[in-house]
Structures are given as C-alpha cells and as structure tokens.
Amino acid sequence: MKNIFALSALSLAFASSAFAGSSYVTGNVQFHDDGRIHGSDVTSTLEAGHTFDNQFGGFTVYTEFDGIQLGKLETENGGAGNTTPAITVGGEQSFNITDHLWVAAGYQHLFSAGENVQYRPLVKIGYNFDNGISLSNRTRAHIDATDADADTDYRMDNRIGYVMNEDVTLSYNNVYMIEAETMDHEFRATWTRKGVQPYFELRSQAHGAENSSGDSLVNNAFVFGASYGF
C-alpha cells in the first residue's frame, strides 16, 4: 500500500512541479441510471498530470483516481457493490510526425485496494485537420496482474473531435473491448474558455455486457466535469 501511495505522490509531484511544459487537473461527477457496473448510482473521477516538452513532442505523466463512489450502492442483480477506487499511474511519450500527424506510446499501472490489478501498455495515433476535425485511436492491452490470471483483453478508443469555434469543442468516442465484446458511446461538449474549462458528457455504457442471469447491464450516465491547465 505504501508503494502505491508513493508512486501516486511522485506522479502528482511531477504534475505540479515547474518543469518546462504544462500541467493539468481534471475531475467529474457521473450520474448513472443503472449503476450496477460501477457499484453506485453516483461516481467520480479525478486526474492530474504534467507534460514535459522534448524534441520529439512531449512526455506526459499522470495519476488518476477512478470509481470514487458517492451515491447509493448497487449490490443486486449483478451490482458491483462497495468497491475501492482504482488508481492509475501512467506515462506517455508523443511523437509529432508532421504538423498534423502524431503517434504516442505509453504504459499505465492499475492498482486497487492496495493490490496490483492490471498492466496496461498502450499505443495511440491521431491526425488533426485544418478544418477543426481530429481523428484518433488508442489501443490498450489489459493484462491481468491478479491471481485470477484472466485472459488479456484489449480496449480500443476511436475518437472524432470537432472544434466548432474558439469556445466550443465537440467529440464522440467509441470504446470497444475486443475479448469481452462490449461497447461504450461517449458524447462530449467542452467550453474551451481560458482558465477552467467545464464539459458535459453523455455516456451509454456496457452494451453487450450481461449479469449471471443474462440481463443487460447497459448504463446511461450524465457526466459533469471541468479541466484546468496551467
């Protein structure tokens, strides 16, 4: 447990230090109409990171606390019930291939309740068009680090974004788990003002997931969050 907090503290220290580059903090509150997959009908996520500028692009380190339960616990019909928040410590190096094309590679380490959960290597690729449209893909392996020794799964995030004007950015992210054969849809609108940037997101999650009785675990969530870069 001490090692987990030490790693998290180290990443947060990097995020807040005055190195060349930029830092950010972001957080949200998620309201679920069926919170069984999260164990609660209200959850929260917090994240902080720092990007170090370098000759290739930038190296970003970050820490995320996910699945912070704030609402009524969901324990019946496949509900996860009371769970410990997941802690992710990660780093990614981006490479600017051209003024529009970029790639990245990184690694995330997932902990929960003082134990290793998953090893998560990842790769990204993206292209930014002059008309405000951007396309990107992130492919991430979920390698089990527990005694269960579960099969490795792969998560694919395919995102399209559009900068409407200097104040509003819209995006859609499609999340697909290859082995589990589940899919999420995430629609986001961000107010890209100076300073704190609030956003609203609509998520439709766990399409294809079922409980032991064969009932669907699909969840719709309204997400309110904000990010601040400095």
Indicate residue ranges for each PLM-predicted region.
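Outer-membrane beta-barrel proteins
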Residues: 2-7, 16-230
